[in-house]
Structures are given as structure tokens and as C-alpha cells.
């Protein structure tokens, strides 16, 4: 493991890469949502390790072999929430991030690659097609709640597609076949207590910010402020943990919830409509601890442009894998 060269391909802000940082030679990430003008969020954790938008940029920084590719290419096109918005499922085979991943595997021929995605991916891009496109690789598929890795989000289900060179099957197959917990899952109450030990301030949107949520009982269903929403959560809607809309099409607003103190937290998403048990909007520190990130994983915030950086940070923390999957990969690689 001492000489491993690891490349991120569409690995966002590096949840899979951070536990293996000393082996990482770069991250090719074409998606603009992960980039900022000076790449402040990336640099605060990875320093000068290349964080680029294309292969052409990457080869200006690094020329050499790649042993392992880690990826969390686009999965939103195959999600339930995406389907509810667009009424159609995406075509991951045509997605630029999946295409880039396959191109980099064919180019570098790594010993191992790991793709984190949504379970639906293999319905749209079957394993038989992966085997046909990458005939030199043998595959292992894991499809589990991330709680199986030790994260607390029981409802967050993820696909882990592992490919390794057939000639190295004896080395990788036994190691990556088993799932185990690298942390102990916790209820929301304990997670919130843990989050207070983090050094980052729990930045969140101002109480007077309006978000696309409404009180279904009102004739004029205008957007509510976070202050109004908190009051409703703790009074009229105190028995609800999903936001009621009570319409003919749906009873609750998709993806909008507040966590229960004595249950596991629900799935965090890049949206700003997820709430703590007391009805307050979730802050950056809450996202960190629920996604499993340690205190040493730093967050860049510029208080002079707080709204922008809260949004960027929420995407960095939630659009991609939980931290425990990266720890699981590291523990497995250490056995080889």
C-alpha cells in the first residue's frame, strides 16, 4: 500500500479520498457545483493536490501510473426525487461523468476501481454491460444501507461497484467481499451532542430567509421564513416529522423533514429544507456529523458571502458518499 497512486474521478470534494490523502495524486471533477474561483474548499483539505475539470488539465500536473480510481459519478438522474421532478429517469450510460470514469479506467488500467452510486444505476446500466465494456475486470457489487458501513443514516442506500483486474482476483476478491462497520451508528440525539465537539461554527441560513415551503391550511400558500417554519414544527405540526401538504397528489412534501431525537437521522441532501428535532434548519456542523466526517475534515466559509458558501459546503458534504465508505476502502486496502 505504501506506493499506491490513487486518482479521484468525479469524486466531488473527496469523501472517499480524504482517508487516503497521502496516496492521492489528483481528482478530475468536471461538475461545476464542486468548484469555486480559487478552489478554497478543496485546498483546505488537500492542499496543492490537483483538482481539475478535465483529463487534459490533469496531465499537466501528473504523468505516471494509477493503481486505484475512486469515483462518485452522477447518480441523481436515477434517484426517486429526480423522477418525481422530471417524471423520467436519466440515462447514466450517456452521462458525462460515467463516460469520463470509463475512459479513465480504459486509459490507466488501474488494478482496482470503486464507484459509489445509487442502487438504481445497475437497473439502467446493467452489470453485464460493465463486464462487456471492461472485459479485463471482475466485479463485486454491494447494495446496502450506509449503516452497514457504520454511518447513522439507515434510510440512505448506496451501490458500491468494485472492479479489479481478473489476474489479481485472489488479491482483491476476498478483501472486498465483506461489508463491516467502521463506526457505530448513533441516534440523532447523540450525533447532535457529538457535533458540539467540532470546531467549525454551525453556520446556517438566517431566520428571515424564505424557502419553498408553505402552510397548506392557508388560502394564500406563500413561501415561509425559517422562523415561521420552526414555530410550526414546534406547535401546530409538532407531531409531524415530514412536512404536511395534504393535497390530492401527496400528503407530505418530498425530501422535507425534521429528524427525531431518538431515531436515526434521515437521509441528508443538498437542499436547504432539512431540520433538526427542535425545528431549526440544519447547519453545516449537523451535515458534517451526520455524513460521518471527522473534525479534521475542514470546511471553508467566507462570512462576507455566507449564503454562497453555505450552499457550496452543503453540496460538498452531501452530494456523494458518506465518510465511512472511504474508511472501509482504506481498511481493505491496508490488508493487501
Where are these regions (language model features)?
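Class I S-adenosyl-L-methionine
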Residues: 60-66, 75-260
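C-terminal target-recognition/interaction regions appended to catalytic cores
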Residues: 215-336
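Residues at alpha-helix caps and immediate loop-helix transition turns in enzyme cores, especially N-
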Residues: 38, 125-127, 321
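Core alpha/beta nucleotide-donor-binding catalytic domains of modification enzymes
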Residues: 2-109, 119-123
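Extracellular structured ligand-interaction cores
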Residues: 3, 156-158, 263-265
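Short loop/turn segments at secondary-structure transitions that flank enzyme active sites
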Residues: 15, 72-75, 165-169, 274, ...
